Amino acid sequence: MMSEVRVRFAPSPTGSLHIGGARTALFNWLFARHHGGKFILRVDDTDLERSTEESMRGILEGLQWLGIDWDEGPIYQSQRLDEYRKFANKLLEEGKAYYCFCTKEELEEMRKQAEREGRPFMYTGKCRNLTKEQIENYLKEGKKPVIRLKTPREGKTVVHDIIRGDVEFDNSTIDDFIIMKSDGMPTYNFATVVDDYQMGITHIIRAEEHLSNTPKQILIYEALGVPLPQFAHVSMVLAPDRTKLSKRHGATSVQEFRDQGYLPEAIVNYITLLGWAPLDGEEIFDVRKSIREFSLERVSKNPAVYDVQKLTWINGHYIRSYDLDKLTQAIIPFLQKKGLIGENYDYEYIKKIVSVVREREKTLVDIADAMTYYFKEVESYEEKGVQKYFTKEGVVDILKKAAETLKNLEPFNKFTAEEAYRKLVEELGISSSALFHPTRLAISGRTFGPGLFDIMEFLGKEKTVARIERAIKFIEENIKG
């Protein structure tokens, strides 16, 4: 039986939570929840110059919005510097690491020499065997050394990867790399190993780009004499053109998707599909199913291709099936941003409109756009609609009859309005589309949307008639008969 699973997500607060990072967090979280384990949030903030509180806040809010909760943390690396120094000193005392006093100029010369010899640059190990006396003299001179790990010159380091199988690295390609910088800060690889060991991390699930760091990290584990966790490197998320996903491919951060009106459940559903799928192959599923079925063995080795159209299609499904109150609450900030409502609004009225508008829309932004004419006067008419319906012979007379009919209608609701329109079609001897289409364009400015009589009921008699009369005026003034 597996001991308690402990996994972590360790973002650097130097940017936003993007789709790849969100997927890494999600896969760790699903794995922990599937096994009844712990999901730990750690913040890799040792790059003090680039780390910002704003970025950290955005990452935490993004995870919370997606429903990815953590059991421990956030734990900040910048608050653990004494721990890294303690472990580095242990390696120095045991002769597994050493002080290196090489200057920038000396390292540059080594780099040039490697270039001249046509080989990749590797640190030569110049300071590997300094005597105690030499070290003391350098320190007395005020030289600030880095600390390097003594790496084996021969043999191979093998990464046993749950997703990729065994990946071998030749030790001759790994130089004596730095574990502590001259300013006393740990390097990424060293801090990562110390943290993962002290936090009892059992499985490291992360992006494929970290695979090249793994042999160095294994060598640190071995030098410290502590057990290795299991590794699982998840393939990259590529853009549709199969290049690295970047801003030029549109929205890539969780915050951008949130601002564009995607629902958190839809994003979680979609990013779960980036390299994994449920047993039945379904594309729409909730997070409970993902937790039940998730396993690393079924994560694909092949790169996942990001497809915003598929995400939007999935989002449309969630928009249609979402709890109506939750959807209404989610849409309100978008309506406020568009200036359609203020701080005080008629919640029930908005909810009724959302119930009919959502059937055709795919994002909250789409819904807010589609709701515009319920709150504001129609400012323009779709050009294709004008050409198709407002230029037809007799349309002004038809709309005048419609306005007159609706003015005298009591009571006014979608059922009585439809009945009156059906009768008018018969009286005028025209097709229903000759009346319905220009009316829709007149009262909404659009050629499609919810049911025509639903719109009329929401607007009420006065607004409906006024908009038809305004359209008549527009046709008479702008369209030459």
From Swiss-Prot:
InterPro entries the record matches: aa-tRNA-synth_I_cd-bd, aa-tRNA-synth_I_codon-bd_sub2, aa-tRNA-synth_I_CS, aa_tRNA-synth_I_cd-bd_sf, Glu-tRNA-ligase_bac/mito, Glu-tRNA-synth_I_codon-bd_sub1, Glu/Gln-tRNA-synth, Glu/Gln-tRNA-synth_Ib_cat-dom
Keyword entries, A-Z: Aminoacyl-tRNA synthetase, ATP-binding, Cytoplasm, Ligase, Nucleotide-binding, Protein biosynthesis
Gene Ontology molecular functions: ATP binding; glutamate-tRNA ligase activity; tRNA binding; zinc ion binding
Residues at which ATP binds: 247
Motif ('KMSKS' region): 244-248
Subcellular location, principal: cytoplasm
Biological process according to GO: glutamyl-tRNA aminoacylation
Reaction it catalyzes: tRNA(Glu) + L-glutamate + ATP = L-glutamyl-tRNA(Glu) + AMP + diphosphate
Compartments where found: Cytoplasm
S-S bridge residues: none
EC number(s) from the headed UniProt entry: 6.1.1.17
Source species, domain of life: Bacteria
One Gene Ontology cellular component annotation held by this UniProt entry: cytosol
Motif 'HIGH' region: where in chain: 11-21
Subunit structure: Monomer.
NCBIfam families registered for this protein in UniProt: gltX_bact, PRK05710.1-4
Cited PANTHER family: GLUTAMATE--TRNA LIGASE, GLUTAMATE--TRNA LIGASE, MITOCHONDRIAL-RELATED
Function summary: Catalyzes the attachment of glutamate to tRNA(Glu) in a two-step reaction: glutamate is first activated by ATP to form Glu-AMP and then transferred to the acceptor end of tRNA(Glu).
Protein family according to the UniProt entry: Belongs to the class-I aminoacyl-tRNA synthetase family. Glutamate--tRNA ligase type 1 subfamily.
Protein name per its UniProtKB record: Glutamate--tRNA ligase 1
Organism: Caldanaerobacter subterraneus subsp. tengcongensis (strain DSM 15242 / JCM 11007 / NBRC 100824 / MB4) (Thermoanaerobacter tengcongensis)
Taxon lineage: Bacteria, Bacillati, Bacillota, Clostridia, Thermoanaerobacterales
